[in-house]
């Protein structure tokens, strides 16, 4: 049994709360396609997906086929969409497990069509046409959609189940960001209209990510794709205070050692922290190998006994040191909240940690190592 005190607590009650918030933010009749890629943003895909399925989520989205297979193997029966498409040789498994995939090339279409024909399971390959409306990543360029759809008709073993796109700057609420999101929405709507003009009847139309859901400035969709908002974090600081979401993840550890140091004493690699007065230093067994960013050196904060303590010196692979001089009553064995809500009321949010680390909340949550840090599920 792993007795290391550095663990992640996942609050399923907070997940349920956030799911309910999202349901209230989308238009009536709009379903939810929960994004559970990257191990549910580090929260653990199995428990999170099982909980969301109980809540009535309409479908799940993952990044690649192996993640979709994991969902099916864990007993998830709701529709699953591979956002990043599949690779050559994966067609038969995709169809056999009744998983849908993004499609953005005729070569993919031909391979899927042939696989569906060969396995003779009397099931078409379900595809969602990915349209590049301005992200510049995956997808059929929006101006090529009419020609692509016309050529797609030659493949009789494919079912165009959905059509979707992805916003590039929906999390930026400045005039330029808003204008580009609206331009993407116009391009997407035109692609959907073209599909219908050519006789396609996609069951699912989706483009709204967490940022678009929060902004509530949506083109017509009958499916929305909440991701980070389900886990209680915000797409960007532009949405701060707009929605009472609850952090689902708490990264915690314990004080392993306390040591008084004299003025002039340096702490950790590179001597980047030097005590200017007598200080009490706590060593805590968490480090960058656990996903606690090294860039939090001399910047990060933690909560002990409801009081804040600053990281003292360079974040190590397995350890950080905290200046706990002003933490009243601190003792070896005390709980340390490194990320998420503390039982005494304060919170180290993913947004706060990301700002100090020079990154984004997504990277903070996804970066907490699953192989080193146990997940404990509550609620």
Curated annotation (Swiss-Prot):
Reported cofactor(s): pyridoxal 5'-phosphate
Pathway: Amino-acid biosynthesis; D-alanine biosynthesis; D-alanine from L-alanine: step 1/1
Pfam families: Ala_racemase_C (PF00842), Ala_racemase_N (PF01168)
Database matches in InterPro entries: Ala_racemase, Ala_racemase/Decarboxylase_C, Ala_racemase_C, Ala_racemase_N, Ala_racemase_pyridoxalP-BS, PLP-binding_barrel
Keyword terms: Isomerase, Pyridoxal phosphate
Record has Ubl conjugation as a keyword: no
Active-site residues, record numbering mapped to chain: 37 (proton acceptor), 269 (proton acceptor)
Disulphide bridges, residue numbers: none
Residues given in the record as substrate binding sites: 137, 317
Catalytic activity: L-alanine = D-alanine
EC id: 5.1.1.1
Domain of life: Bacteria
GO terms of biological process kind: D-alanine biosynthetic process
NCBIfam families: alr
Physiological role: Catalyzes the interconversion of L-alanine and D-alanine. May also act on other amino acids.
HAMAP family linked: Ala_racemase
UniProt-recorded name of the protein: Alanine racemase
């Amino acid at each position: 049994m792993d007795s290391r005190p550095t663990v992640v607590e996942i609050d399923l009650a907070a997940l349920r709360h956030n799911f309910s918030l999202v349901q209230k933010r989308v238009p009536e009749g709009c379903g939810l396609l929960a994004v559970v890629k990257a191990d549910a943003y580090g929260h653990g895909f199995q428990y999170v997906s099982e909980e969301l399925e109980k809540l009535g989520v309409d479908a799940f989205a993952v990044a690649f086929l192996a993640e979709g297979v994991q969902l099916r193997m864990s007993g998830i029966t709701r529709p699953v969409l591979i956002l990043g498409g599949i690779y050559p040789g994966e067609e038969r498994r995709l169809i056999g497990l009744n998983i849908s995939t993004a499609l953005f090339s005729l070569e993919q279409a031909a391979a899927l069509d042939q696989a569906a024909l060969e396995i003779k399971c009397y099931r078409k390959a379900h595809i969602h046409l990915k349209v590049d409306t301005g992200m510049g990543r995956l997808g059929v360029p929006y101006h090529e959609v009419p020609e692509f759809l016309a050529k797609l008709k030659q493949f009789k073993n494919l079912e165009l189940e959905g059509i979707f796109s992805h916003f590039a700057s929906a999390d930026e609420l400045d005039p330029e960001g808003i204008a580009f999101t609206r331009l993407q929405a116009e391009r997407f709507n035109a692609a959907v209209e073209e599909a219908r003009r050519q006789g396609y009847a996609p069951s699912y139309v989706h483009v709204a990510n967490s940022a678009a859901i929060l902004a509530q400035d949506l083109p017509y969709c009958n499916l929305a794709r909440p991701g980070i908002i389900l886990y209680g974090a915000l797409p960007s600081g532009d949405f701060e205070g707009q929605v009472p979401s609850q952090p689902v993840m708490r990264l915690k550890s314990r004080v392993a050692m306390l040591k008084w140091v004299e003025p002039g004493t340096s702490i950790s690699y590179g001597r980047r922290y030097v005590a200017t007065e007598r200080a009490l230093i706590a060593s805590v067994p968490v480090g960058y190998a656990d996903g606690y960013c090294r860039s939090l050196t001399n910047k990060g904060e933690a909560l002990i006994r409801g009081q804040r303590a600053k990281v003292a010196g360079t974040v190590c692979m397995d350890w950080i040191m905290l200046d706990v001089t002003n933490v009243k009553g601190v003792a070896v064995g005390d709980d340390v909240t490194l990320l998420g809500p503390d039982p005494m009321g304060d919170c180290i949010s993913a947004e706060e940690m990301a700002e100090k680390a020079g990154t984004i909340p997504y990277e903070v949550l996804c970066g907490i190592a699953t192989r080193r840090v146990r997940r404990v599920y509550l609620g």
